[in-house]
């Protein structure tokens, strides 16, 4: 009797992707975050779908509809807090996933890496438009400030901003289209995830040693399905602790006040996962320069395959680059902290130093350390 999963046209694809997939036997828990991101995406789509059933994308009722979800809908408060804190868990997993890719040299699989960058940007866009939907003070002013950055584009900037707003300010038309974008983008992300996996399975997974693992592969199921299951349980535990015990810890108190175009909050800031890019944006006095730096802070990830000159794969046997890598992580944490601080001395100066360091490490220090380590190997 033929095995169904190996012969059925549809099940065969699933089998080659998740069951009989040859996987390096040495991959560590840092490789769990890909599957955790998949789980986060499913949680976000499901909770988002239930929220969309009760939400109204109208400036007069949006804030009230979110309050209604929390007060009157069965377990509405739980669905809302799972969705809001699920976004934070999503970005934590995303940052670790990208960090692991840099540390272990996964960027040499350039197609997978580039699709990953597109996924990162799409996820950031989804989170941004989602943050506008509750129509609180920070939602409104965050949308106004960030969309207004496009006015820095020469010639077409002002027209472009008004086109995105659907008027002369952030208003009903803006909220309606942002809701439409927030609904459709997760499905685009899902399609991109499939392309990401397709490219990954063309080459096979990387592994911690950075060596060729063709001679040492094991089937994905049951070894890594069980391992992923443990990761998923820990993720759900962390999400539940966050949603049930500290639901508002990562939110902004200003967002409990309905949007008021006549009253600007003292400190306009985005969600915590955008603060590093926001700090880079604010550290440049010129508006257009700030916007370019903001975009480059993400797109610079695409330079990793191009600037990599190392004869070794990953950083596991490269102490100099390891030191630079962990300096880079510390620098990112500093940027995140600065992004949440007011625009005053000494925070502006620290932000400028951290922003320069961010780009210097990637463009100059890492390639230089690659060359030094290559020369050390020759000795």
Swiss-Prot record:
Subcellular localization = Mitochondrion inner membrane
Q: Where along the chain is heme b b562 bound?
A: 83, 182
Question: What cofactor does this protein call for?
Answer: heme b
Binding sites annotated in the UniProt record for a ubiquinone: 201
Superkingdom of origin organism? Eukaryota
Question: Does the entry feature the keyword Metal-binding, yes or no?
Answer: yes
Q: Name one GO molecular function term.
A: ubiquinol-cytochrome-c reductase activity
For this protein, what does the record note about how its cofactor is bound?
Binds 2 heme b groups non-covalently.
List the record's Gene Ontology CC terms alphabetically. mitochondrial inner membrane; respiratory chain complex III
Gene3D superfamilies tied to this protein: Cytochrome Bc1 Complex, Chain C
Topological relation to the membrane, as annotated: Multi-pass membrane protein
Gene Ontology biological-process entries: mitochondrial electron transport, ubiquinol to cytochrome c
**Is Methyltransferase a UniProt keyword of this protein?**
no
Locate the residues binding heme b b566: 97, 196
Residue stretches spanning the membrane: 33-53, 77-98, 113-133, 178-198, 226-246, 288-308, 320-340, 347-367
Which Pfam families does the UniProt record give? Cytochrom_B_C, Cytochrome_B
Main localization of the protein?
A: mitochondrion
UniProt entry keywords in alphabetical sequence: Electron transport, Heme, Iron, Membrane, Metal-binding, Mitochondrion, Mitochondrion inner membrane, Respiratory chain, Transmembrane, Transmembrane helix, Transport, Ubiquinone
Q: What does this protein do?
A: Component of the ubiquinol-cytochrome c reductase complex (complex III or cytochrome b-c1 complex) that is part of the mitochondrial respiratory chain. The b-c1 complex mediates electron transfer from ubiquinol to cytochrome c. Contributes to the generation of a proton gradient across the mitochondrial membrane that is then used for ATP synthesis.
What is the similarity comment for this entry? Belongs to the cytochrome b family.
Q: What else is known?
A: Heme 1 (or BL or b562) is low-potential and absorbs at about 562 nm, and heme 2 (or BH or b566) is high-potential and absorbs at about 566 nm.
Task: Kindly state the subunit structure of this protein.
Answer: The cytochrome bc1 complex contains 11 subunits: 3 respiratory subunits (MT-CYB, CYC1 and UQCRFS1), 2 core proteins (UQCRC1 and UQCRC2) and 6 low-molecular weight proteins (UQCRH/QCR6, UQCRB/QCR7, UQCRQ/QCR8, UQCR10/QCR9, UQCR11/QCR10 and a cleavage product of UQCRFS1). This cytochrome bc1 complex then forms a dimer.
* PANTHER family, alphabetized: CYTOCHROME B
- What this protein is called in its record is Cytochrome b
Name its species: Akodon albiventer
């Amino acid at each position: 009797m033929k095995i169904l999963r190996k012969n059925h046209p549809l099940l065969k694809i699933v089998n080659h992707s998740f069951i009989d997939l040859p996987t390096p036997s040495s991959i560590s828990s840092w490789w769990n975050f890909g599957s955790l991101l998949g789980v986060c995406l499913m949680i976000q789509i499901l909770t988002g779908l239930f929220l969309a059933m009760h939400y109204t994308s109208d400036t007069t009722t949006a804030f009230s509809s979110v309050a209604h979800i929390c007060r009157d809908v069965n377990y509405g408060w739980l669905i809302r807090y799972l969705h809001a804190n699920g976004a934070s868990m999503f970005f934590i997993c995303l940052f670790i996933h990208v960090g692991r890719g840099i540390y272990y040299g996964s960027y040499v699989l350039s197609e997978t890496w580039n699709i990953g960058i597109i996924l990162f940007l799409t996820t950031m866009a989804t989170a941004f438009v989602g943050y506008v939907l509750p129509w609180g003070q920070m939602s409104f002013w965050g949308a106004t400030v960030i969309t207004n950055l496009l006015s820095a584009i020469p010639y077409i900037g002002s027209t472009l901003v008004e086109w995105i707003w659907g008027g002369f300010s952030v208003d009903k038309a803006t909220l309606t289209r942002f809701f439409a974008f927030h609904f459709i983008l997760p499905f685009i992300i899902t399609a991109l995830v499939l392309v990401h996996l397709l490219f990954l399975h063309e080459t096979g997974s990387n592994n911690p040693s950075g060596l060729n693992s063709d001679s040492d592969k094991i089937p994905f199921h049951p070894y890594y399905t069980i391992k992923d299951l443990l990761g998923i349980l820990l993720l759900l535990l962390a999400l539940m602790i966050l949603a049930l015990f500290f639901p508002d810890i990562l939110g902004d108190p200003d967002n409990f006040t309905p949007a008021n175009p006549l009253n600007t909050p003292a400190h306009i800031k985005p969600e915590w996962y955008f603060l590093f890019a926001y700090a880079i944006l604010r550290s440049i006095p010129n508006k257009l320069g700030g916007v370019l730096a903001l975009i480059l802070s993400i797109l610079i990830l695409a330079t990793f395959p191009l600037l990599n000159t190392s004869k070794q794969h990953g950083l596991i046997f490269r102490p100099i680059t390891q030191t630079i890598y962990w300096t880079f992580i510390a620098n990112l944490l500093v940027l995140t902290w600065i992004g949440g601080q007011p625009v005053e001395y000494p925070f502006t100066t620290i932000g400028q130093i951290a922003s320069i360091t961010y780009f210097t490490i990637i463009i100059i220090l890492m390639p230089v350390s690659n060359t030094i380590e290559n020369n050390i190997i020759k000795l």
